[in-house]
Amino acid sequence: MTLTNQYGAPDAFVRAMEDDSYSKGDADFSVTGLLQPPQIARLRAEHEDKLSADVRDRVWMLLGTSVHNTLEKYGDGIVEQRLFGECEGVTISGAIDLDKDGHLTDYKVTSVYTVQKALKPDWEAQLNMYAWLLEQNGREAKSLTIVAICRDWMQSRAGKNNYPESMIVPISVPLWHSERRDRFVRQRVEVHTKEATLPCTKEERWSRGTYGVENEKGKLKTFDTLGDATAFINKQKTGRYYVRDVPGRYIRCESWCDVSQFCSQWQAEEKSNG
């Protein structure tokens, strides 16, 4: 991937982003790689030499790296340890930010909005895949925690309307049982190693307003996820409700996917929408 600097960021930013020391080690997939949509991962691999990103759009990665590099110096336990495991003949690796006697912690630089919403499924899955890796290495995970650092936190809003009291927010993550972890890892390996590439799901595309809940009178209310739509239906005391697909937006495809120009799924939709 080529790094561009269309908006004139200082050279120090460019050099910092070019100095990418990340490696998944001697593994076929990393934990974060397996959590990516398989279509995006495959298109990135196929078109790597054609991809580019601008410094402006990668500052958030620099912030995250800086926080990790600082905190790993002071962790009370095993820090940034890369573990390896095998599943279906595939080698998987993952770097755990902090392991203190089986209590795993992962740091996330994120937004207040993200913290205020329900726990992100990808975060829950990532921490449980780390627990799986720990088990593959003969150790037991006892608890999982995400420590969110809210980059846009404002003290003037602290404690109001579910606004976090601090910029630093520990989030407890449910620890799945061993069988569920095994099953999930196998499923992710399967979707990434299939000969035919699977299209991205609505959730993977960050859909907005694509799930419609309609009542018997034809009144429609839209939701971003199937879970939100189902939760709304479950709260209704009377009447019949139906979930159906409705036109909406796909934020990732529109603005955040670096392979959208190579994606037949997105290009076909763009063409059909005129």
Residue ranges and their predicted role:
Residues 1-104, 111-125, 135, 148, ...:
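Metal-dependent nuclease catalytic cores that hydrolyze phosphodiester bonds in DNA/RNA
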Residues 2-8, 88, 133-274:
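Metal-dependent nuclease catalytic regions and adjoining charged, substrate-binding loops involved
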Residues 104-106, 232-233:
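Active-site-adjacent bridging/hinge elements
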Residues 120-123, 127, 178, 182:
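Short, charged, low-complexity patches
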